[in-house]
Amino acid sequence: MGIESIKEHLQPVSEKIKSLRSHDKHDHWLINEIGFKDVDYYTADHVLIGCPQHEGVQRNKGRIGAAEAPDKIRKQLYKLQMPENSEIKIFDAGNIKTDIYNNIAEDDILNEMESSDALNRIHDALTKAVETFLKDGKNVIVLGGGNDISFADVRALSNTVKESSVINVDAHLDMRLADEMTSGTPYRKLVEGNHLKPENFYEFGIRKENNSKKYLEDAENQGTHTFFLPDVLKEGVTTSFKRILDDIQDKPFFFGLDMDVIQAADAPGVSASSPMGLTGREVIDMVYLARQKENMRILEITETNPTYDIDDRTVKLVSQIIYCYLLG
């Protein structure tokens, strides 16, 4: 299909990021090996794309700020050292154009119809982009933004393959009932839209105290596989996660990481922080395990919120997670 078919939806990476360089000639940063030109797309095996908006978070009454995450993450990721003899090829497609939301204040409420239509258009553009990458044989890394983008990314995978699995590593089910899309509704809308079969859906790290009884019952009744945080910690995080990977077998799968699943000590800069959660090390171990399976097609990381970060702790953790995914 080619990168040209979706360029109207893409905002290229800023020159400031592309020009990142070390003061030490002996450093070999990841930025030196990232492709930004259209021609680089065709030789890449991995494509990175950002979706810098937090409209869905705002609708869900969360803390806004996630729109700033994709470029903040890039700045940390691209300063990490490139391992010697690595053959991985990465193309950075830039960000989905989301200008309509970039400068909206928290109390500046758009007309409901305008807001809904705009967010739907953003999701449509992201679905088209990710679907293009998948059909061109690329593995995809998506940086949010709010967790509502899971609707767009899972839909893209569903449109591309006959059957797929979805892992949502999250403190929340994100199965709220609502007419409009929010960061709390993507998986309900995916199931209702026949883009996701409940028996192929795994919720991991869920905290009962952060989810309504109705939605917990809905997940159970429809056949979703739910792994609650206390059970995961008791069994062992990697042991529990391996059971999911074994169950998925060879089906192409989506790995969605909502950063609020991680304890605030490791990830303070998220849309909904909590002192309870997985550790950063545990999540990196999970990503490493998932990466060993060649059928992992999408890594999506959402709800990083630089506004509330401390010394870039959260964006640095995200960069390490991506680095592990790419380079082990």
Residue ranges of each PLM-predicted region?
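Conserved alpha-helical scaffold segments that buttress catalytic/binding sites
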Residues: 2-328
